[in-house]
């Protein structure tokens, strides 16, 4: 169960991470504290997912660096445009046998609330439930700053579906190695 939760979290972050490779050096850091991020897949029979993230400047940069750098290596196009308070990111990235072309529009403030609208098109790779091959998918994210992190949270903690994990631990094995 924990491994599936990690996989789902990583999938969501990498899907959103399509904006990170192009924007990692350009996006301002989010305000330190507790953020709630609601992810909604549009036009697919997938329930909305809400996650909370306790961040500070270091863990926000770590997230951008980990997911942004990994994805950047796989992207042939990364274009970012800033117009006032709107950031637009276009990218073409290859992951295994799949090529993902994405367009993201980011609005709002990284101090209080922001919205990310992502549309993407996949070519190749395994089929996704509810998505025709080559079909477009849409996802929206709404990030809201809730205040200070709870006393039992440390920067990098993410809570999704009632389970807590830390961004620093995502690459670590779930089960300790056998002696």
Go through each PLM region and give its residues.
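Bacterial N-terminal signal peptides that target proteins for export
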Residues: 1-13
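N-terminal helix-cap/turn-to-beta initiation motif at the start of protein domains
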Residues: 23-33
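Short, solvent-exposed loop/hinge segments that bridge or flank secondary-structure elements
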Residues: 37-74, 162-172
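Short beta-strand segments that buttress and anchor functional surface loops
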Residues: 37-40, 88-95, 116-123, 130
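Short, surface-exposed coil-to-beta transition loops
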Residues: 48-49, 98-103, 136-140
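Predominantly extracellular/secreted and cell-surface proteins with exposed
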Residues: 53-110
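Edge beta-strand at a domain terminus
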Residues: 131-176
């Amino acid at each position: 169960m924990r491994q599936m939760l990690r996989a789902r979290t990583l999938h969501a972050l990498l899907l959103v991470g399509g904006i990170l490779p192009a924007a990692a050096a350009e996006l301002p850091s989010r305000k330190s504290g507790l953020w709630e991020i609601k992810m909604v897949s549009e036009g697919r029979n997938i329930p909305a997912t809400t996650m909370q993230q306790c961040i500070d400047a270091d863990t926000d940069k770590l997230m951008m660096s980990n997911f942004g750098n990994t994805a950047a290596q796989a992207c042939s196009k990364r274009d970012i445009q800033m117009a006032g308070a709107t950031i637009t990111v276009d990218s073409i990235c290859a992951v295994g046998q799949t090529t993902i072309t994405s367009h993201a529009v980011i609005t709002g403030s990284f101090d209080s609330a922001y919205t990310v609208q992502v549309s993407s098109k996949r070519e190749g790779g395994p089929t996704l439930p509810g998505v025709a091959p080559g079909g477009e998918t849409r996802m929206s994210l709404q990030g809201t700053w809730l205040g200070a992190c709870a006393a039992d949270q440390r920067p990098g903690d993410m809570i999704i579906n009632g389970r807590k994990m830390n961004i620093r631990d995502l690459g670590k094995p779930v089960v300790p190695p056998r002696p």
